[in-house]
Amino acid sequence: MGLQACLLGLFALILSGKCSYSPEPDQRRTLPPGWVSLGRADPEEELSLTFALRQQNVERLSELVQAVSDPSSPQYGKYLTLENVADLVRPSPLTLHTVQKWLLAAGAQKCHSVITQDFLTCWLSIRQAELLLPGAEFHHYVGGPTETHVVRSPHPYQLPQALAPHVDFVGGLHRFPPTSSLRQRPEPQVTGTVGLHLGVTPSVIRKRYNLTSQDVGSGTSNNSQACAQFLEQYFHDSDLAQFMRLFGGNFAHQASVARVVGQQGRGRAGIEASLDVQYLMSAGANISTWVYSSPGRHEGQEPFLQWLMLLSNESALPHVHTVSYGDDEDSLSSAYIQRVNTELMKAAARGLTLLFASGDSGAGCWSVSGRHQFRPTFPASSPYVTTVGGTSFQEPFLITNEIVDYISGGGFSNVFPRPSYQEEAVTKFLSSSPHLPPSSYFNASGRAYPDVAALSDGYWVVSNRVPIPWVSGTSASTPVFGGILSLINEHRILSGRPPLGFLNPRLYQQHGAGLFDVTRGCHESCLDEEVEGQGFCSGPGWDPVTGWGTPNFPALLKTLLNP
């Protein structure tokens, strides 16, 4: 059957399922641990589905990202506006017409788009959705630490073949909400009392990374930062105020968030949400802070997609965004990963600095055809984000040199090839490291991460008005590094320079200047006889455990202030 035949009678094709294809044949549909099915959804129940429409000029977008992010380029710092990006990538008129005609034929009338017109979110009944997407069968599920309810399909969906050039994927069918990987570790044993700290607080962060009481935002510049939250949990203003009363006495700070984008619920505060806000606002002290709250409260929504669509619908955004979200690369479809990567590319073109946590499972581990391999995570493995690993103090109660935090995520992507900006650093690591795992465990030619690191072990957090000690994870290191970059943006903006934007090309060109090199320790991996739980190990220069290292603020400011 030819394309013209497929285009004729779309509604009949929806009903018959003929002349169809699967956009996400490789999407994992196994039920994540901790989730249970509650049975079929009511046919008249409504859900929302997000249609990712095919974009134009993605290769040109990639070239522009390189041009505006490379300090040696005459285009460096000349970022695109949202309108520029929209003009470049907006779906073709044929794509817009074809998809809209198909949706209208199926009775989908409650739809809204974004400025770039490349996402379309529609509300449909379950009955309509199952007719629209042959093969889909929607069930209720409950799971996660907060007993979250979602509607998902355990079966693959199909689209009419006529839509193959026009739709990348449909969101809201398979992917389950992320879960927090934060750990609360046992308190280490104290062996002395001189010069001790009793856990990581803002004063410990500021001392270790050489931030003085004067290293805060001016409160007068057009500078802002943001964190994004997807775990159906919230921060509380009262917790932030108490945290600053307890730990913010030695530096100027803001005790409230400037703006919440999305839904801010009234339930109990979440530790991860509290951690993100409290340490972004204490490292990037006295800088206007936004919180993107995309909890995915409606059962059909994918909260990470919601956040990406918010970025595509706001012309004026904070310069630095920190995100503590990730999934195993192998759990996601190729169509989804490639499209999300393009969204991250769009943000880089606009001069946004996106920082993602590297994860808290070391190198990870899974079995492929009976053999163990390391397990990279995404979006940490995207070549268009700066990924943050984790460290611990060499002496747990002393502000000393840092070593690897054994949970710090890192490794090599199985999806994205190594970007040119890190070719020299990664090649040097692979040729000089004395402790490389067997080559069968990782893809040595893939995008390597993390890029940088910060302390990730033993934080104090205030949640539901209770100070909680020994919270650990790269969800802690990421907002700390983000706040420090916001302070550098403050100096750049006040001196008439553009914000840092996508950092990696510059970071790798400067070979770790302005960072403390972390050279001791290894992270965890597969518990088998061959690697015995050990992944990669840190060493001089860049490594796939702590990247280039942790921030030394005065030196990093000097390195990144010009041009």
Curated annotation (Swiss-Prot):
Location of this chain's protein in the cell: Lysosome; Melanosome
PTMs per UniProt: Activated by autocatalytic proteolytical processing upon acidification. N-glycosylation is required for processing and activity.
CC terms in the record's Gene Ontology section: extracellular exosome; Golgi apparatus; lysosomal lumen; lysosome; melanosome; membrane raft; recycling endosome
Consequence the record notes for mutating N286S: In CLN2; enzymatically inactive; lacks one oligosaccharide chain resulting in enzymatic inactivation and possibly prelysosomal protein degradation; altered intracellular trafficking
Propeptide: 20-195
Tissue-specificity statement: Detected in all tissues examined with highest levels in heart and placenta and relatively similar levels in other tissues.
Residues at the catalytic site: E272, D276, S475
InterPro entries linked: Peptidase_S8/S53_dom, Peptidase_S8/S53_dom_sf, S53_propep, Sedolisin_dom, Tripeptidyl-peptidase_I
Disulphide bonds in the chain: C111-C122, C365-C526, C522-C537
Signal peptide coordinates: 1-19
GO-annotated molecular function: endopeptidase activity; lysophosphatidic acid binding; metal ion binding; peptidase activity; peptide binding; serine-type endopeptidase activity; serine-type peptidase activity; sulfatide binding
GO biological process: bone resorption; central nervous system development; epithelial cell differentiation; lipid metabolic process; lysosomal protein catabolic process; lysosome organization; nervous system development; neuromuscular process controlling balance
Recorded consequence of changing I287N: In CLN2; displays no residual enzyme activity; altered intracellular trafficking
Phenotype upon changing D517A: Inactive. Impaired processing
Domain Peptidase S53, chain residue ranges per copy: 199-563
Keywords of this entry: Autocatalytic cleavage, Calcium, Disease variant, Disulfide bond, Epilepsy, Glycoprotein, Hydrolase, Lysosome, Metal-binding, Neurodegeneration, Neuronal ceroid lipofuscinosis, Protease, Serine protease, Signal, Spinocerebellar ataxia, Zymogen
Pfam families: Peptidase_S8 (PF00082), Pro-kuma_activ (PF09286)
Subunit: Monomer. Interacts with CLN5. Interacts with CLN3.
Protein name according to UniProt: Tripeptidyl-peptidase 1
Organism: Homo sapiens
